Each structure stands twice: as structure tokens, then as C-alpha cells.
Amino acid sequence: MSRNLYALVVAATAIGLAASACSGSPNSATKATPSATATQLQSLIPTPANTQRTDGPDSIPDNGIHLHFLVNGSSTDVLDAYKTALEGKGWMVTVVSSGRWAGAGGATYTGTQGDTYGVFSGGGSASAADVSACAWPSKPSNPNCGGGNRR
């Protein structure tokens, strides 16, 4: 191969590599993933066993949703079972706080599932528990999910 032809092949290869690096790829790691819809978020939130009433989903800031469940059963048992149900739905769960007293108690969990972020909290008596569940397409700057003004 002549020196000029070799230089031309090297230049063409370099241009081809540069062009392919600049073109979009359907498998690009930097490709933006679409935000989850409220319906998709709701499908990620399990309904606790023995739920007697469900409120929501309600829209909350940062494209999130909030659900409230009133559940029959000891609040400590309800929240322990709910953590297991979240993990069964694919959530990576972190216990933020938990406490028990005379059959009553409460807990707050955070969770991630891919980019989706959730806050799950609840508490109550020895016979009933309130559970609030919130999910967002990605972690919001203020992941407020319960009590007070969520809007």
C-alpha cells in the first residue's frame, strides 16, 4: 500500500469513528429515560394486606403521587408486612425510622426502583394503621409524603 493510500485509509477511519461517536445510539447510556406517569407510579405501590380503605392517588409536587391506606391490624405488623411487600415489588428499601410501643408503632421507609423514588410511612394502634405511600419519577428536592400540606 502506498504511503498516500495508507494516510487516506487512516484519515477515513478516524473520520468514521468520530462520526459514529457523535451520532445518537439507541443504546446510549446518556439517553434520557421518559418520566413515569401517575399510572405507572401507582402500579409500583403495593396495596397493604387487610386494607379497608384506599384514598388517592392524589397528585403531589414534582410529578409524584400520594396514596393513603387504612389497614386493619397491628400497626407494627402492618408496617413490617408492607416493607416486605415493597421489596417484593422490586423496591430497594431503607428504614429511616421505626418504633413500637404496646402493640402500636410506626415506621418511615424510603425506597428506589431504578430512578423512581418513594417515601412510605405509617403508624397507628394495636388494631389499625394508616399508611401513606408517595412515589416520584426521580428523587424530588423535597420528598414530603405525609401529614400537613403536601401540595
Regions found by a protein language model. Name each.
Residues 2-8, 15-18, 23-151:
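An acidic-aromatic pocket/loop used at catalytic or ligand-binding sites
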